[in-house]
Regions:
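Gly/Pro-enriched, hydrophobic low-complexity segments
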Residues: 73-187
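N-terminal mature ectodomain segment of secretory-pathway/periplasmic proteins
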Residues: 1-49, 58-66
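Intrinsically disordered, low-complexity boundary segments flanking structured domains
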Residues: 46-53, 64-67, 120-121, 156-159
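A short, amphipathic edge element
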Residues: 54-65, 113-117, 169
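Extracellular/periplasmic catalytic domains that process cell-envelope and extracellular macromolecules
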Residues: 54-55, 69-72, 87
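A short, hydrophobic/aromatic-rich structural module that often spans a beta strand
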Residues: 54-62, 128-131, 188-189
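Short, ordered beta-strand-loop transition motifs
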Residues: 28-30, 66-75, 125-126
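Right-handed parallel beta-helix
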Residues: 59-67, 74, 93-95
Length: 189
């Protein structure tokens, strides 16, 4: 696949946040060009929407490789560690379909105990197996009730308003593959 255009329908169910559904058109061209277009506001994690293994391996080192059985057949499990000390993600597990080398799941452990799981589904589009659904779930360990008890000698600190859990679902549709996208689409505006 040299280039493609795809429509993304994004829904989010995130604790403590009201996020309206989003409709975004994504343009992609080899080797690593992306552009997003939407009529309204859209906030998308580029690395999650269009998974790029070479970019991932530039930021993480492979620590372990294993093989497992899954519902779809065989998978390779790669355990990755962050190359930099200041990385937000300390550890990644990437599960890759052994037949076509596409990621099926990515499990991420963050420095503060939170975790993120991304699950990919694929369908044939013009003879190519392309993403059809991405589900991202994030969670945090339960709050320690002992931490919430006020200490009479300390100034009270505001509790974090960060979401503790949620799900983001991205549906891919309307693919146009190898249409010869112009580089002009990717110029920053």
């Amino acid at each position: 696949v040299q280039d493609y255009t795809v429509d993304l329908d994004v829904t989010a169910d995130i604790e403590r946040m009201n996020v309206p559904p989003m409709h975004v058109r994504m343009y992609y061209k080899q080797p690593d060009k992306f552009q997003f277009a939407s009529e309204g506001f859209a906030l998308l994690p580029r690395d999650g929407v269009a998974f790029n293994a070479s970019k991932l391996l530039s930021r993480f080192s492979v620590e372990e490789v294993g093989e497992e059985s899954s519902q779809g057949g065989r998978e390779f499990r790669l355990l990755l560690r962050a190359r930099g000390e200041r990385a937000k993600t300390t550890k990644l597990q990437v599960f890759v379909d052994a037949d076509d080398w596409k990621p099926t799941r990515v499990l991420s452990s963050l420095f503060d105990g939170r975790s993120v799981t991304a699950a990919f589904k694929y369908e044939k589009q013009n003879g190519h197996r392309m993403p059809s659904l991405l589900t991202v779930e994030f969670s945090a360990p339960p709050a320690d009730t002992m931490d919430q008890m006020p200490d009479p000698d300390e100034v009270p600190m505001p509790r974090s308003h960060m979401p503790r859990k949620g799900t983001i679902t991205i549906k891919y549709s309307g693919y146009k593959i190898n249409s010869g996208l112009s580089d002009d689409i990717f110029d920053k505006k």
